[in-house]
């Protein structure tokens, strides 16, 4: 497994006023981060508008980001969603495109129990091979993953880390 240490940036998804993705700005932004010494990019995470763009745009931005990075930095796909099925589908799509790592925020709005969180992540990892990084951001999701839940999930070899915000 690749070393996931260093500076990782949760990249914004640049858009035009009409909501279309600005791929020229995406390339410029990624190139700037590469030349500035950034070690890894998280594409279409919560900072990248994952909750507001459609599945096709999500796919296209993930794919284009990986093409632009072209092995120069570590690429992490934002695959979190409120729906477990959608998070699974995004994880499978990221894996198909060529990502090795995904960042998956806890489901928001529905406020799952700790048991529900375990079931959510176990379901996703049971359906895909991509390595998952848990993302706990209770101030945004109204759901706080407890240390005991993280401990239980850490027993899963496909869950390789956590982003705590």
Region locations from a protein language model:
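Catalytic beta/alpha-barrel core
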Residues: 102, 157-165
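Acidic-histidine catalytic/liganding microenvironments
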Residues: 72, 156-157
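Active-site beta->alpha loop and helix N-cap motifs at the rims of alpha/beta catalytic domains
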Residues: 1-9, 13-144, 150
